[in-house]
Regions:
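Non-transmembrane, aqueous-exposed alpha-helical and coiled segments at domain scale
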Residues: 1-249
Length: 249
């Protein structure tokens, strides 16, 4: 497996320790996935923000990673564990939650991420974009693969961050056209008049999947009978619901 020149340079430590660590992760992921090449990525979206889900390990990891480098492509950040204005209402039973939460956010910011704190990076306007992304948020993955020309695998927070710091990802999975083939056919014979209808459709599609089906990249429905015009909100409702069942597109 031949490395792109810049990725090899990062792996050798020529661009600092932060990017060297990220490059090592990208290369290790490529070996694990059996990838034969790497692709240049245009945008990344990183999950793993809440101190409750990431714990002290996330804080230590980010503290260890920060300091010698920043992201090389536009990168947005997923939602945090709370709104600081709603702390009392949320009644979060976690010691020093707010302080630790903002420590994590500031660590990401120091790496150059846009602290958008949103799980819908497509709200920034990607309908006309094309190329490759590295997104670690299931509803965002389903939306962009379904409604735009921007292609992404369903990444982890760590793989999306490693790609953000290097600009590269292993070429595998949904990056390859042969893996983006519908494996379910859905015929619509009813009117979809409300956003709830679109959400129910996505939910219903997901519930048809059986554990014994051989669909390594998840269910990918080909939906027939949809109206010629679908609003942005309806698209969002459909793919967000279907993503709950592992639909990547």
């Amino acid at each position: 497996m031949e490395l792109p020149k810049r990725l090899a340079s990062m792996l050798a430590g020529d661009e600092g320790l932060t990017r060297q660590k990220a490059a090592r992760l990208v290369v290790d992921l490529a070996k694990t996935a059996g990838a034969k090449a790497f692709i240049e990525v245009d945008h990344s979206h990183v999950s793993g923000v809440s101190v409750i889900t990431g714990g002290h390990g996330l804080r230590r990891f980010l503290a260890d990673l920060a300091g010698e480098g920043s992201v090389v492509i536009p990168t947005t950040l997923n939602s945090a564990g709370c709104d600081k204005r709603k702390m009392e209402e949320m009644d979060i039973d976690f010691p020093d939650f707010l302080e630790q939460q903002f420590e994590i956010i500031m660590a990401y910011e120091s790496l150059g991420l846009e602290t958008s704190l949103s799980c819908t990076p497509y709200d920034r306007g990607v309908e006309d974009e094309a190329g490759f992304a590295s997104w670690a948020e299931s509803n965002a993955v389903a939306f962009t693969n379904s409604w735009t020309d921007l292609i992404t695998n369903r990444e982890s927070g760590l793989s999306a961050l490693a790609t953000a710091l290097t600009g590269y990802a292993p070429e595998w999975g949904l990056h390859l056209e042969e893996n983006r083939v519908p494996n379910i056919v859905v015929d619509i014979e009813c009117e979809l008049s409300t956003l709830s209808d679109w959400s129910i459709l996505g939910d219903w599609i997901g519930k048809q999947v059986r554990p014994n089906w051989n669909i390594p990249y998840g269910p990918m429905p080909f939906i027939r009978g949809l109206p010629s015009y679908i609003s942005f909100a309806s698209k969002k409702a459909l793919t967000a619901a279907a993503a709950n069942y592992g639909c990547p597109m």
